[in-house]
């Protein structure tokens, strides 16, 4: 285990925010987690776990031990004629894992193709797209519990998965995820909930065709971080009450929405942002992408403060126009490497 000091993280966050941590270590073996924790304690440092850097807002400098989870490997734990359970290490690239599973006839994750990041980050936000969430297929999560100071296994039920939510987000900073298992299907049950996806896939739908369709849609709508640094979808789709939606629909009858199990309505945040005039609009080096209003882009040398100023203005404008609160998705880090709550713009 080799610790590096004053390590530049600019290339390790997809928004390309200039950032430097006091201490950094890249781990390829989960057995090195405990030595890394001992190092942090001995030096009075908090621990910040870095995965793919795709859902992060980093400060220019922070005092913490950044543990970069780069473990690799996959193995089949069990299988039968209908299902397969695959254990995958946290450092594997998410999109590569999804594509490999589909190619081998292990299905369920196709709608989540091309989401940036590594596998270990999938349970934290319970990543989701086009009607599918990772938590639906996660069976077990292996992690180190910093509170109990021991390795643990959590079932999907214990993970408390919700919309862009989990126990790992609720108790941020407590768990270091190093592996997880997915229960996937050998007979594809395609999710074609979204009209755009269903139309493109067509009647002769297959898992491979669905996978390629999702990839094509995301490539057309979303900027690649290498060209336009971004953190993916920046705001959660707000879930509002039936009365709130009724008020919205009275003025905007074509507002995109999705019925929830509890009678609530999920409204498309990108549509709200577009209607408020923010699609393609910029404040200095920060703006919302011209082809997808939900994606915030660093067009130059933006700082964390520039990003915060922009998204807080968007929150204010949306609330004033629709009386709906938008919540940012990315994790915000403070100067001590701790996950910090976003300051409300309302």
Predicted regions and their residues:
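Phosphate/pyrophosphate- and phosphate-bearing ligand-binding catalytic cores of soluble enzymes
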Residues: 4-5, 10-14, 56, 151-305, ...
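Anion-binding (especially nucleotide phosphate/pyrophosphate-binding) glycine-rich loop
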Residues: 2-141, 145-147
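Beta-rich strand-turn-strand
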Residues: 106, 304-307
């Amino acid at each position: 285990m080799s610790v590096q000091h004053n390590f530049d993280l600019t290339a390790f966050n997809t928004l390309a925010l200039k950032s430097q941590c006091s201490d950094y270590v890249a781990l390829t073996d989960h057995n090195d987690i405990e030595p890394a924790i001992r190092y942090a304690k001995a030096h009075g440092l908090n621990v910040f776990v870095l995965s793919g850097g795709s859902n992060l807002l980093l400060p220019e400098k922070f005092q913490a031990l950044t543990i970069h989870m780069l473990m690799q490997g996959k193995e089949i734990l069990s299988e039968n004629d209908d299902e397969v359970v695959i254990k995958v290490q946290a450092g594997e690239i998410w999109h590569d894992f999804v594509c490999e599973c589909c190619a081998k006839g292990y299905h369920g994750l196709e709608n989540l193709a091309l989401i940036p990041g590594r596998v270990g980050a999938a349970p934290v936000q319970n990543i989701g797209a086009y009607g599918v969430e990772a938590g639906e297929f996660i069976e077990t999560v292996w992690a180190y519990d910093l509170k109990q100071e021991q390795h643990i296994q959590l079932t999907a039920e214990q993970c408390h998965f919700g919309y862009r939510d989990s126990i790992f987000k609720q108790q941020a900073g407590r768990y270091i995820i190093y592996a997880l298992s997915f229960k996937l299907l050998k007979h594809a049950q395609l999710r074609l909930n979204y009209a755009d996806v269903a139309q493109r896939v067509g009647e002769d739908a297959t898992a491979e065709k669905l996978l390629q369709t999702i990839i094509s849609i995301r490539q057309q709508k979303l900027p690649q971080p290498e060209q336009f640094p971004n953190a993916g979808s920046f705001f959660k789709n707000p879930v509002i009450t039936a009365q709130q939606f009724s008020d919205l629909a009275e003025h905007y009858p074509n507002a995109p929405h999705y019925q929830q199990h509890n009678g609530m309505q999920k409204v498309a945040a990108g549509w709200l942002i577009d209607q408020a005039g923010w699609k393609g609009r910029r404040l200095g080096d920060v703006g919302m992408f011209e082809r997808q209003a939900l994606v915030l882009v660093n067009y130059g040398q933006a700082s964390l403060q520039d990003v915060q100023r922009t998204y807080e203005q968007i929150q204010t404008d949306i609330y004033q126009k629709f009386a709906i609160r938008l919540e940012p998705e990315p994790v915000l880090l403070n100067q001590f490497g701790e996950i910090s709550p976003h300051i409300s713009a309302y």
